[in-house]
């Protein structure tokens, strides 16, 4: 089956893929933001994180493709990761080039006393190895760094080991680049970051009237700045630029390693050579509307607001990445579940939905749940979500008339049509991301249920409570529900179960005491009385 007729791609965009980790979703998103970009390969490129606000509409027509030019950063990856990669993946040509690289670097390092240059190089290697992000166990070039700065962002590169031969040198491998290196297979950076970058562009292109309609429909609490797409665009541009430029010393060290080879590796991998001149090697995103469903702009706008808030906060660099990764996790779950709910509603499928703008609700429980009724309700909520995603994907039939005829005539064809969607998209994504972030337990075995951990709760506070301010606990519960469909109190649980057609015994008045306890232990709850508490965001705004 081609990806164009994969029903999950038609529903969720190309592509939200289970084998892409949440850190790789974030990495790919920031990679696009940091790279030179263009809507037309023959036109002007732009270096800003986002397209100009006034140019968003031009690039969002059907068939439009955003093109971006990621750096491969092979020398930096080789220097950092080769020694920690699988022995079987270490090609002699790579070892030889690493030795050359270290030798040239050593000539530019001056030490005092009995400090050996080799020890300095080892310390520099260990620093960047400690910033390893995703891909542990892969070939060194297929691994990623934590996306802490511009030079920690690199495109996907895969070494075609089966094509290599004994006499191959590092530079020989670039003469026939596509033979020995693959830069466009999207195995790990599988386009999920592209989907959410394009979704952001789609959301910011909407009119102020559209956004006001969303705020009214979804009962959202946005500031005047957040309710204005142009002002939100400006805030996001500043926040993304600040993030990418927040570790200048790290970038200086990375530049020292990369530039030592006179950029020969980068010259071969990052540029296209036509008539003696080099221009950036562009990667094309998928075209609208296959790239990102246009009806997803509403959740895209809510995501843009949440993202802008966290980017504006004064956080330690590592915590900022952790919070952004968790926000991406929550948004991925929201993306697939909301679009599934919309499909079920539009096709009038016989599955009850939550009566909120998202169309779903997640009934959560504590990790170590001692309340059998609550544990059971959370399991039911998980299974209902599974059914939603399954039914939505399986409501699609082939668009091509001949294939549609085969679909109805052959059960084998029908099985094959949905096979990839069920295996690697849809609920496979929900399950994989949910378990990796701790939202679904247990990781293995039966009885899966939805839980609310301290890490998820902290991200919810940072995304929903203004920096350095407080909101009431009741308002916080409402915000969590309206943004993410997550419920944990008695009345909301009973309503959620009723709306989705599931019987529910009274779960008890103090069913959510565990949430307030977690907030209080994390210094994010201010008790005022038995009936009123404030949820506090302890992080201040970044005024730099």
Please give the residue ranges for each predicted region.
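Alpha-helix boundary/N-cap detector
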Residues: 20, 44, 69, 73, ...
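Charged, amphipathic alpha-helical stretches
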Residues: 1-126, 130
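Intrinsically disordered, low-complexity serine/threonine-rich regulatory regions of eukaryotic proteins
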Residues: 78, 83, 97, 101, ...
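Extended, Lys/Arg-rich, non-catalytic nucleic-acid recognition/anchoring regions
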Residues: 112-221, 226, 230
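Generic structural signal of hydrophobic/aromatic residues within well-ordered alpha-helices
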Residues: 26-29, 46, 56, 78, ...
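Eukaryotic partner-binding/assembly regions in large regulatory complexes
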Residues: 165, 183-440
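Extended, charge-rich low-complexity regions and/or helical-solenoid scaffolds
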Residues: 392-544
């Amino acid at each position: 089956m081609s990806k164009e007729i994969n029903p999950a791609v038609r529903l969720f965009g190309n592509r939200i893929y289970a084998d892409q980790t949440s850190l790789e979703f974030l990495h790919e998103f920031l990679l696009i933001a940091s790279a030179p970009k263009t809507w037309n390969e023959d036109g002007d490129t732009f270096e800003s994180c986002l397209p100009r606000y006034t140019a968003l509409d031009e690039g969002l027509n059907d068939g439009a493709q955003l093109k971006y030019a990621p750096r491969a950063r092979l020398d930096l990856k080789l220097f950092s990761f080769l020694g920690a990669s699988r022995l079987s993946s270490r090609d002699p040509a790579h070892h030889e080039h690493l030795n050359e690289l270290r030798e040239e670097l050593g000539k530019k390092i001056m030490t005092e006393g009995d400090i050996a240059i080799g020890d300095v190089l080892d310390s520099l290697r260990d620093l960047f190895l400690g910033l390893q992000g995703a891909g542990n166990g892969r070939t060194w070039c297929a691994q990623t760094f934590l996306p802490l700065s511009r030079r920690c962002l690199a495109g996907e590169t895969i070494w075609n080991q089966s094509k290599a031969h004994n006499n191959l040198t590092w530079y020989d491998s670039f003469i026939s680049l596509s033979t020995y290196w693959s830069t466009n297979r999207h195995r790990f950076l599988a386009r999920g970051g592209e989907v959410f970058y394009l979704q952001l562009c789609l959301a910011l292109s909407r009119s102020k009237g559209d956004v006001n309609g969303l705020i009214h429909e979804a009962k959202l609490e946005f500031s005047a700045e957040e309710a204005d797409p142009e002002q939100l665009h400006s805030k996001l541009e500043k926040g993304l630029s600040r993030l990418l430029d927040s570790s200048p010393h790290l970038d200086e060290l990375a530049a020292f390693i990369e530039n030592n080879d006179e950029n020969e590796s980068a010259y071969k991998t990052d540029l296209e050579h036509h008539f003696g001149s080099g221009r950036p090697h562009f990667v094309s995103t998928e075209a609208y509307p296959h790239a990102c469903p246009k009806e997803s702009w509403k959740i895209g706008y809510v995501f843009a607001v949440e993202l802008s808030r966290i980017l504006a906060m004064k956080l330690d660099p590592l915590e900022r990445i952790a919070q952004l990764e968790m926000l991406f996790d929550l948004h991925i779950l929201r993306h697939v579940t909301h679009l599934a709910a919309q499909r079920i509603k539009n096709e009038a499928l016989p599955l009850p939905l939550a009566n909120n703008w998202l169309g779903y609700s997640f009934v959560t429980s504590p990790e170590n749940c001692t309340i059998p009724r609550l544990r059971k309700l959370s399991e039911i909520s998980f299974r209902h979500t599974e059914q939603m995603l399954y039914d939505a994907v399986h409501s699609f039939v082939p668009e091509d008339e001949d294939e549609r005829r085969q679909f109805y005539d052959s059960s084998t064809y029908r099985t094959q049509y949905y096979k990839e969607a069920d295996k690697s998209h849809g609920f496979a994504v929900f399950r994989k991301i949910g378990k990796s972030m701790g939202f679904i337990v247990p990781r293995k075995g039966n009885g899966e249920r939805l839980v609310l951990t301290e890490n998820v709760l902290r991200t919810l506070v940072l995304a929903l409570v203004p920096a350095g301010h407080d909101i009431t606990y009741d308002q916080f519960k409402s915000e969590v529900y309206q943004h993410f469909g997550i419920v944990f109190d008695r009345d909301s649980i009973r309503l959620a179960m009723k709306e989705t057609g599931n019987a529910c015994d009274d779960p008890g008045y103090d069913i959510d005491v565990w949430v307030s306890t977690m907030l209080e232990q994390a210094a994010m709850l201010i008790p005022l009385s038995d009936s009123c508490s404030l949820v506090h965001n302890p992080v201040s705004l970044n005024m730099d």
